[in-house]
Amino acid sequence: MESSQAYFPPSANKKHVLLTWAQSINGRIGYVVESPSLGQLRLSSKESFVMTHLLRTKFDGIMVGSRTAENDNPSLTAKLPDPANPDCLLPLNKQPIPIIVDSNLRLDYASLKVIRLARERLGKPPLIIVAPSIWQQVQHDSKLKEAVKLIQSVGGRCIIRNEDSPDSWSDYVALDKLLQNGVNRIMVEGGAELLAKAFGSTDIDAYVVTIVPKIFSCSNTTEIKNLNNLNLTTNSHWYPCGPDVIFTNYSDEFYESYKSLLTNSDAI
């Protein structure tokens, strides 16, 4: 990915892919494996959490990998002006589409928040990216068939990519098929493997990195690999965000929108 100036908010009529993640000073982004006793690795401050939810309102879809969906069970919704308050969930027409890259359809969909929220019409139905060889097994595998049935029961769909293990990140996430379905603006929130695959792609348009003033042990946390493939040296800006700092190639309009939201909730 070559770093160039990205304009905010992104146009609704053209492809725009954002990579965004939060990391500690020593580059840790989450726990290696799910740990009920530890919970989710808490990184972002209240202020940067607001920034993330502001971003979500400007995108058609939010993409995560299957490991993030399993470990964190995110709702992938937008809540403003206070993301921590369930009553601040925005109307359905302002919600992004959850996109989960689950190549093997291995997730327990009955337990996922995105399924429950879609059923309750509080969130949009999800799109699930699936490998073609797995899709061919659906009619003969009761567990796979049940997963597809559950996804479809809430209005969700499976998007079948062209190859099982493509080299290209864009092919891996079926970017062309997402665009064909009107999902032009895509916000990729993780996890580490999905982000690492994206760093060499020419289809990435923007990045927003939240760096938090914390240090975590390397023994039970993970980092993002292949960061050297992401050119962060030009056309980038540093912005304060509470105790955190934001590193991005978005234009100043991005930070101005964020500051407006902090002082005026009507800016949503």
From Swiss-Prot:
Keywords: NADP, Oxidoreductase, Riboflavin biosynthesis. Belongs to the HTP reductase family. InterPro entries: DHFR-like_dom_sf, RibDG_C, Riboflavin_Biosynth_HTPR. GO terms for cellular component: cytosol; nucleus. Its EC number is 1.1.1.302. Catalyzes an early step in riboflavin biosynthesis, the NADPH-dependent reduction of the ribose side chain of 2,5-diamino-6-ribosylamino-4(3H)-pyrimidinone 5'-phosphate, yielding 2,5-diamino-6-ribitylamino-4(3H)-pyrimidinone 5'-phosphate. It catalyses: 2,5-diamino-6-(1-D-ribitylamino)pyrimidin-4(3H)-one 5'-phosphate + NADP(+) = 2,5-diamino-6-(1-D-ribosylamino)pyrimidin-4(3H)-one 5'-phosphate + NADPH + H(+); 2,5-diamino-6-(1-D-ribitylamino)pyrimidin-4(3H)-one 5'-phosphate + NAD(+) = 2,5-diamino-6-(1-D-ribosylamino)pyrimidin-4(3H)-one 5'-phosphate + NADH + H(+). Pathway: Cofactor biosynthesis; riboflavin biosynthesis. The keyword Lipid metabolism does not apply. The lineage of its organism: Eukaryota, Fungi, Dikarya, Ascomycota, Taphrinomycotina. It comes from Schizosaccharomyces pombe (strain 972 / ATCC 24843) (Fission yeast). It comes from the Eukaryota. GO terms for biological process: riboflavin biosynthetic process. NADP(+) binds at residues 68, 72, 103-106, 191-195. SUPFAM superfamilies: Dihydrofolate reductase-like. It holds the Pfam family RibD_C. Homodimer. GO terms for molecular function: 5-amino-6-(5-phosphoribosylamino)uracil reductase activity. It is an enzyme of class 1 (oxidoreductase). This is 2,5-diamino-6-ribosylamino-4(3H)-pyrimidinone 5'-phosphate reductase.
